């Protein structure tokens, strides 16, 4: 944990790094601990006042490793938020992660999702979807969303 950070974002971002692009943009402006579930061996979230969960969308939901981390490692009552990227927008993309945090009685402070470059399955044959995303506007909107989380936490 960083010496002053009160917020952590637990994430998984693999194929094109779409989600990580958003998180790195945020971390250039604000002190936030980014925890990559694909590299962390033990995750202790007990020292954070707010925890974010971030992922690309895989088969309509957050990556299983992020959902499992929320179930196993999230302290009860800690406010949470979600950030995600998707190839195509569908309903209920945050349902699995929301269900995981609800077991810990955690208030959900909001979510931000945007398009991300996607070459999964048949999309690869046509060169992928959303080639230029996340773009500058997506990054800016992610930062504005994060600023609402900070204001919520401070207020």
Regions found by a protein language model. Name each.
Residues 41-47:
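Short amphipathic alpha-helix with an adjacent loop that forms part of the alpha/beta core around
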